[in-house]
């Protein structure tokens, strides 16, 4: 079956109602841009990780067919055989916007359009929706355009922005979980060649670490909380000196756990959680369990992670000083 008619070779096209107009007519520009947008939404639906987003995008694509058909008709009389955009579709877009934006953190500056493939495609589709809106405004200066169509296309670009933010947030959270899991699993699986080496923190190690930390804290006249976890992040010792801040009882174990989970000192995480860095959002995604300022150290022996030490109560520099002094008292290192 031939798909060509040759009737458009002279630069004109036929509307649904039979009139022939130039292919540069504002009406053709408007529904032609909607066609571009519809094609872009197919790419978005293929890339979206969220099943609800895919379902919504496919529904929007069907609605754009109705939208285009209405623009491609010169008649203002509704056809009983045709579907039309209504307030119901606008309400569905607004509900989708609210759901998506409830899942993401507020922004206080401009962002690059998309850090994952799905978000990038959605942002691109958003720009096409904006262009379609401009074409529709231009068309409305020449012919009657239902106000509900103007509202729909305006809301659609907002919806695509919200979906892009949600896809970005989900992808970033998944990356963080993968990275943390990778580091944690690596810490829990020592090389086979080291299996017979006594690598766990002994009672003597725990005693020496705690004693050395307390003695250094007393020298600095800083009451602190000392917390030690094993290689699995399980708390083994926590000692609170008299007059130590109550919040330190929360922070010291978190510092020790973070050091084991991330296999690094907590102060070394500061740069990688900044906006735009690989682990940006790590603290919020793990509900505050991760600490990214000084005072937590991973404890290594013979290249194997054996535990973590967390100190809290003084300034960041004092906490790090106390931890380093305690670590020096036993046969462990702070890096693999």
From Swiss-Prot:
InterPro entries: CblAdoTrfase-like (IPR016030), CblAdoTrfase-like_sf (IPR036451), PduO (IPR009221), PduO-typ (IPR029499), PduO/GlcC-like (IPR005624), PduO/GlcC-like_sf (IPR038084)
A Pfam short name: Cob_adeno_trans
Note: Bacterial microcompartments (BMC) 100-200 nm in cross section are formed during aerobic growth on minimal 1,2-PD-B12 or anaerobic growth on 1,2-PD-tetrathionate medium, but not during aerobic growth on glucose, anerobic growth on glucose or pyruvate-tetrathionate. BMCs can constitute up to 10% of total cell protein.
Inducers of expression: BMC production is induced by growth on 1,2-PD vitamin B12 medium.
The protein's name: Corrinoid adenosyltransferase PduO
Note on domains (UniProt): The N-terminus (PduON, residues 1-185) has adenosyltransferase activity in vivo and in vitro; it partially complements a deletion mutant for growth on 1,2-PD. The C-terminal domain (PduOC, residues 194-336) is required for full complemention of a pduO deletion.
Gene disruption phenotype: Decreased growth on 1,2-PD cyanocobalamin medium; no growth is seen in a double cobA-pduO deletion.
Residues binding heme: 207
Signal sequence annotation: none
Subunit details: The C-terminal domain (PduOC) forms stable octamers and also crystallizes as an octamer. Forms a complex with PduS.
Pathway: Polyol metabolism; 1,2-propanediol degradation; Cofactor biosynthesis; adenosylcobalamin biosynthesis
Record's catalysed reaction(s): cob(I)alamin-[corrinoid adenosyltransferase] + ATP = apo-[corrinoid adenosyltransferase] + adenosylcob(III)alamin + triphosphate
Subcellular location: Bacterial microcompartment
């Amino acid at each position: 079956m031939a798909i060509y008619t040759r009737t458009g070779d002279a630069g004109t096209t036929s509307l649904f109602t039979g009139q022939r107009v130039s292919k540069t007519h504002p009406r053709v520009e408007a529904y032609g841009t909607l066609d571009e947008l519809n094609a872009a939404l197919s790419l978005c639906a293929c890339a979206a990780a969220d099943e609800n987003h895919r379902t919504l995008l496919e529904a929007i694509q069907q609605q754009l067919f109705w939208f285009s058909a209405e623009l491609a008709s010169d008649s203002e009389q509704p056809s009983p055989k045709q579907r039309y955009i209504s307030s119901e579709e606008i309400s569905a877009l607004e509900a989708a916007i609210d759901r998506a934006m409830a899942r993401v953190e507020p922004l206080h500056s401009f962002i690059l359009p998309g850090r994952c493939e799905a978000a990038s495609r959605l942002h691109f589709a958003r720009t096409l929706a904006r262009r379609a809106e401009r074409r529709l405004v231009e068309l409305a200066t020449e012919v009657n355009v239902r106000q509900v169509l103007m509202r729909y296309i305006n809301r659609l670009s907002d919806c695509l922005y919200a979906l892009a933010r949600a896809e970005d947030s989900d992808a970033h959270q998944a990356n963080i979980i993968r990275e943390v899991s990778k580091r944690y699993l690596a810490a829990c699986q020592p090389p086979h060649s080291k299996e017979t080496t006594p690598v766990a923190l002994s009672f003597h190690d725990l005693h020496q670490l705690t004693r050395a930390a307390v003695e250094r804290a007393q020298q600095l006249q800083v009451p602190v909380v000392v917390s030690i976890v094993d290689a699995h992040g399980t708390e083994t010792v926590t000692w609170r000196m008299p007059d130590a801040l109550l919040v330190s009882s929360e922070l010291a174990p978190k510092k020790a756990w973070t050091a084991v989970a991330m296999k690094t000192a907590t102060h070394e995480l500061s740069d990688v959680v900044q906006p735009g860095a690989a682990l940006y959002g790590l603290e919020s995604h793990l509900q505050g369990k991760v600490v990214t300022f000084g005072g937590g150290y991973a404890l290594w022996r013979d290249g194997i992670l054996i535990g973590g030490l967390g100190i809290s109560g003084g300034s960041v520099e004092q906490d790090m000083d106390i931890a380093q002094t305690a670590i020096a008292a036993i046969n462990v290192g702070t890096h693999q």
